Every structure is written in structure tokens, then in C-alpha cells.
Amino acid sequence: GFKTVAKLSTQTFSRLFPKKSNWIVELNNWEEVKPKVEQNFKAHCYYFDVHCSKPPYYGIKDEGGELLAFARFTAVQWEIVRMPGKMGGFLTKTIPFIPFLNRIIRPKNHQFLVPDIVWSKNKDAQLLNELFEGVLALKNQHLILWWVDQQDSYYKAVQSKIKWGILHKMIGASPVDVVQKTQSTTTNEMKTPVFVSAIDMV
């Protein structure tokens, strides 16, 4: 049968007016980020680097050139037929007419960024906040959707320290089950977090 072996969070990061960061740099060399990616993600279940090894990446470097944070971002465009929940149909029709909120959610042309291989030195939440907001400003976007294992040590370290934005205040972080087909009748939970590649979620 099928077993739920892990749970992901659909974590939103939104800014109505994202602030530009002068510290954001574009990185085009997989070898520059590879050691940190493998150090932090290689032990994750389902880890593979077919997609995450393809630049560009966006990061933060200090004045000495040390890499302090980075992630890879995939630009996504969806059409939302119906929002979730009892009021979903109503919200889908009304959000385009609600000032400011319609910057973040545009049902007919819903654009956002999806990160993977998210990392910051010493699991620094302030660096991650700077990275996410700076990339939103750079890409002229207002929303990031980050799918990440709820048991991921990095996510657990930064979760309560990030200003996730107005959309998170409205809907929180939605859970997603990772389901695996198995012949065993026992629960087969993952012993390490699941590696989530952006391309698998969009």
C-alpha cells in the first residue's frame, strides 16, 4: 500500500514592497556551492543534484568575498482556479480587487519563486531573510513558496525567527504528505529529512 513517510511545509515568504539588497550576488559556478550543498543535503532522503547543479544561484557575500548564504530559485507561473478552504471560491474572485493583497496573489497570472538548496552560515535567520527579500526585489516578485521537510534542522532553526510576511499570517504553513508505495505493513518513516527539489513541486 501507500504510506506517509514524511511531512513537508508549504512555507510562504511574502513582501508587498520588497527591499533591494546590495549584498545579493549571482553565482554561476556549481563548484562554488557544491561543497556546502553536499555537506548539508547529501544525507537527505532522495537527494540528487541533477537540477540543483544547474546555475544560476543567488547568494550573499561579505566584504571579504566569503559566501554567507545562497539558494537556487525557480520562477513559476500558475493559474489558480480555486483557492483552498470553504471561502476559496469567494476569495479567488475577490482577491484581484483587494489593494496590496493582489500584489501577492493574482489568480489569473500567479507568479512566484520556489527555492531549493537553501543555506545560510550558522543557520542565520537574518541572512536568510535578507536573501529571500533581496531576491524578490531583484526579480520584481512578491512571493516565495518554499517546500521543505518539517524535520529539516535548518528549517527548524530559522522557522520562528523569520518575518514570513502577510500571507503567512493569513494562511500559515500548509502541510504536504510525502507518500511512498511499500509492501511492508509497518510504518516506514524517513530517518533523515526529505530533499525537496523545486522542479518536483511545480
Question: What is each PLM-predicted segment?
Answer:
Residues 1-111:
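Amide-forming acyltransferase catalytic core, primarily the GNAT-like/NAT-type
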